[in-house]
Amino acid sequence: MNQYKNFIMQFEDIVGNNNVLIDEPMKKHTSFKVGGPADLLITPTTLEQVKDSIILCRNNSIPYYIIGNGSNLLVRDGGIRGVVIKFLKLGDIKVEGDRVIAQSGAPLTNICNEALKSNLGGLEFACGIPGSVGGAVTMNAGAYNGEISQVIESAKVIDKDGNVFLLNKEQLDLGYRMSAIQKYHYIVLEVTFKLHNSEYDTIKNRIMDLNRRRTEKQPLEYPSAGSTFKRPEGHFAAKLIEDTGLKGESIGGAQVSEKHSGFIINKGGATAGDILNLIEFVQNKVMEKFQVDLHTEVRIIGEENN
C-alpha cells in the first residue's frame, strides 16, 4: 500500500494538482527505460516549491529522491518508497557576459546551445552528455578531456533542512565523479559557468566533431545510462571488460554493448534486475581475471521486487 497518499493534497498545494503523480512507473523517467513505481512523483516549477517540498518531506520523515533527466539512474524493479522530486520544469538559462546561469533541471545540451549562440566556448565537451546540469555538477561529469570542474564558477544548493546557500568552485571540491554535493547530500538548484569568448564556427565545429565521435563509438541507439562503470585507476573499464571476453554478454534483455564494452544497454525488454545481475557478473569476472574492482558510475536507487 502507498503509505504517502495522505500527503497528496499537501504536495498539490505546493506544486499544483497537475504536477503530482501517484504510483508513477519510473521506467518513464529514466534513460534505461526500466524501474518500478514511485509512490509519488512531483515536478516543482520554482525553486521555492523545491524548498517547500523538501521541508514537507523532512517534517514528516518522508524519504525523497531528486532526479533530473534520469540519464545516470537505475531504479530497481520494486520502485521507490517515498517521493521523487523531478527537476524537469526547472530549466531556465540566462547569459550574462561570459557567464551562463542555469537552473538545475536544464539539459546540458540546451546550455551548450545557449553558450554557442553567445559565442562562448568551454562547454563543448558536455554537449552530447544527456543529463541535466544538476546531476552533471553533482558527479562532476566529463568527456573528451573536459569536465564540469573546468568551467564551473559556483552553485546554489539546498541542504536537507531547507537552507539555501552558494558554494564557490573550491567549496564544491570537485574530483573524478565526485563532489562536496555528494558528500554532504546537498541538492543543486542553480549553476553558474564562467566561459571564454570564442568564434561561433570554432565552437560549432568542435561540438559537431565530438558528437560524430560519440555516434561512431557509443551505442546511442539503445537505452542505457551512459558509461556504466567509473574508470579504475590505471585502467580503462571498457578495455578490462573486453579483455575479459564479455563484449556482447547478455542476461535477459540487458547486454554488454558490442559497440562499446563500457556500456550496459537495454537491448529490449530488460528489467532492472537483468541490468543489476549483468553489472554484478561483469564486476565478478573482471575481479577474477585482473583483480580490479569496478565501481558503478550509474546511481542505483529503489527497492527490490518482493
UniProtKB/Swiss-Prot annotation:
Keywords, comma-separated and alphabetical: Cell cycle, Cell division, Cell shape, Cell wall biogenesis/degradation, Cytoplasm, FAD, Flavoprotein, NADP, Oxidoreductase, Peptidoglycan synthesis
Family: Belongs to the MurB family.
Principal cellular location given in the protein's record: cytoplasm
InterPro entries (UniProt xref): FAD-bd_PCMH, FAD-bd_PCMH-like_sf, FAD-bd_PCMH_sub1, FAD-bd_PCMH_sub2, MurB, MurB_C, MurB_C_sf, Oxid_FAD_bind_N
Pfam families attached to this UniProt entry: FAD_binding_4, MurB_C
Cellular component, GO annotation: cytosol
Pathways involved: Cell wall biogenesis; peptidoglycan biosynthesis
Top-tier EC class: oxidoreductase
Full protein name: UDP-N-acetylenolpyruvoylglucosamine reductase
Active site: R177, S227 (proton donor), E297
Gene Ontology process terms (BP): cell division; cell wall organization; peptidoglycan biosynthetic process; regulation of cell shape
Gene transcribed to yield this protein: murB
Protein's job: Cell wall formation.
SUPFAM superfamilies: FAD-binding/transporter-associated domain-like (SSF56176), Uridine diphospho-N-Acetylenolpyruvylglucosamine reductase, MurB, C-terminal domain (SSF56194)
Domain FAD-binding PCMH-type: 34-198
Superkingdom: Bacteria
